[in-house]
Amino acid sequence: MKKKTIILLWLVTAYSCSNYSSRLKAVLDYSGTNRAELEKVLDHYSQDPADSLKLKASIFLIENMPGHYTFGGPYMKSYNEQLGLLKNCPYYEKKIIQMVPFDHIGYRQQLDIQEDVKYIKADFLIHQIELAFNQWQTRPWNEGVDFENFKEYLLPYRVENEPLDYWRDSISP
């Protein structure tokens, strides 16, 4: 029974992959070992027809991941640990301080580029999509924002190349 389930799951995944656009396929191929994480997001929103807009949103995000990255490596890890010691520093001030190494060439040489497409985790992306949809559908200031504008302006999980962060949690009630 378990073997049949695995085979069925593999066939469904293989079939659904064949329905992907060439752009999405190219991004999934480029993602390397992180492909499974991205496919988890697509699978998550492929289960229920009520999630069809969320599936389109997840495809939009994944297709647009190439070129988006953050910096990592031992220096950044140490820097973030030091930043974590600032217990009473407001969230937004910490975010500004966190960006300092990105703006100085001397620091940048000590940092590794971590491309979203190769590092982002499914749980993070699903969480961001859920909160974005919740904010889009429940906030009065979003009235009249259609899906295309939502995707472009409200859905993205980052602004530039700042570290990946659960920033939406800081503005959710």
Where are these regions (language model features)?
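Bacterial Sec-dependent N-terminal signal peptides
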Residues: 1-24
